[in-house]
Amino acid sequence: MTNITLMNQLTPKQIVEKLDQYIIGQTGAKKSVAVALRNRYRRQLMDESIRDEIIPKNILMIGPTGVGKTEIARRIAKIVRAPFSKVEATKFTEVGYVGRDVESMVRDLVEVSVRLVKEEKMQLVRVKAEKNAEKRLIKLLAPSQKKKQTTSQNPLEALFGGMNQPDESPEEEVDQELKNKRSQIEWRLQNGELDDEIVTVEVKEQQNPMLDMMRGAGMDQMNGMQDALSGMFPAKKKKRKVTVREAKKILFEDEASKLIDADELAAEGIHRAEQMGMIFIDEIDKIASKEGGGNAQVSREGVQRDILPIVEGSQISTKYGTVNTEYILFIAAGAFHMSKPSDLIPELQGRFPIRIELDKLTQEDFYKILTEPDNALIKQYKALLKTEGIDLIFTKEAVERIAEIAFQVNQDSDNIGARRLHTILEKLLEDLLFEAPEINMESIKVTENYVNEKLAPIMQNKDLTQFIL
């Protein structure tokens, strides 16, 4: 199912309801994102004459860490399978300096988009690809004698990794004994009897680690060189010994890739990134510049000016082709403790017309976060201990006390929002998680007294609270 179909089925109200399954509160932020998403679908239905005039209304989320800014954007992208990329504004540097180039956020988005499209296309060719992969696997498990004897290799072929070793041609005679053997292997393969057997397969070698390392150091300009070098020579292959189970996956991906048109994949990936893509720029408050800040402030303003043309709409070159950023939805977020949105350059402020202030989490919110979402923390710890054969039970009073402690610690020290619950629960259940394999009990109940016993000594010592919780 494509993302356009998914968006067609989901109204803004339904999108908010889906977000409620994972995120507590922040109704205003959820509504704004849901409307922005629905507007993209509405735009697709318009006449081409007016469609090009309608650009997404970018969103600026303002609120302390841990209240759900990133999670809202991440979940919304998952719900509609839209290309989504998260970047941190502090990782970028002004053009001409060592560091990440702001254009890399668009390249990252296109990579995600192409991967999403490829996954969908692989599902369309799955039946044929699996059949082809199975045939190759059977030939690897029962090779012909003629193929076994062919060991000579051209020296240049050895240098550049060679081409795929051809399977025997359809015209090649296969004796009856080999046919019978392959028939037996096919039956055993389909019944999973050979899944743990070892087989040797040829896989593409990873790209040059030196180029990878240089890219990791922030040299995004190495992308073009890397792609140019990789296109000059055939993909180098190496032999790996893997289980039949792994070989099935490797050969399936290889066969599926052969059935997918690379040009069509790139074109559709770019189109989806342009029309449906979302880029989440976190920590944008850290590049807000204030008067009298010296060289550091000048550099921050330079990053803002580099981001501006991308948000406004510009043509960015990627290895798949040129991307127009005009219709990409940008969601920026920041705590704005030390600065305010008006400290951003006016041109950039104007490109984020929708501003949402997210609420600080209350004690009641903490209680709901612990119990209501589909991926609630308490459910996660229950599932972890269930693997040891232990049923972990939390009383209502215990959960209320955990929520109270989390809220109190956030009030007394740095407010890190819902992330505080991770720290508190890990400290609370530390001994239990350590001793679980040796505990001979079917169930363990966490009560309010247990919570007080484990956390009260730390709560009473303010210095310890700051370091441990």
Curated annotation (Swiss-Prot):
Q: Which CDD domains match?
A: RecA-like_HslU
Q: Which organism is it from?
A: Listeria monocytogenes serotype 4b (strain CLIP80459)
**HAMAP family xref list:** HslU
Pfam families in the cross-refs: AAA, AAA_2, ClpB_D2-small
Gene of this entry: hslU
Residue numbers binding ATP: I24, G66, V67, G68, K69, T70, E71, D282, E347, R419
Which domain of life does this protein belong to? Bacteria
Q: What is the lineage of its organism?
A: Bacteria, Bacillati, Bacillota, Bacilli, Bacillales
* Assembly and binders: A double ring-shaped homohexamer of HslV is capped on each side by a ring-shaped HslU homohexamer. The assembly of the HslU/HslV complex is dependent on binding of ATP.
Location in the cell reads:
Cytoplasm
Q: Which family does it belong to?
A: Belongs to the ClpX chaperone family. HslU subfamily.
Reported function: ATPase subunit of a proteasome-like degradation complex; this subunit has chaperone activity. The binding of ATP and its subsequent hydrolysis by HslU are essential for unfolding of protein substrates subsequently hydrolyzed by HslV. HslU recognizes the N-terminal part of its protein substrates and unfolds these before they are guided to HslV for hydrolysis.
Give the principal location in a single coarse category: cytoplasm
What start-end ranges are recorded for coiled-coil regions in this protein?
none
The record ties this protein, via InterPro entries, to: AAA+_ATPase, ATP-dep_Clp_protease_ClpX, ATPase_AAA_core, Clp_ATPase_C, HslU, P-loop_NTPase
**Per the UniProt entry, what are the Gene Ontology biological process annotations, in alphabetical order?**
protein unfolding; proteolysis involved in protein catabolic process
Name of the molecule in the record: ATP-dependent protease ATPase subunit HslU
What keywords sit in the KW lines?
ATP-binding, Chaperone, Cytoplasm, Nucleotide-binding
Q: Which GO terms describe its cellular component?
A: HslUV protease complex
- What Gene Ontology terms describe what this protein does at the molecular function level? ATP binding; ATP hydrolysis activity; peptidase activity; proteasome-activating activity
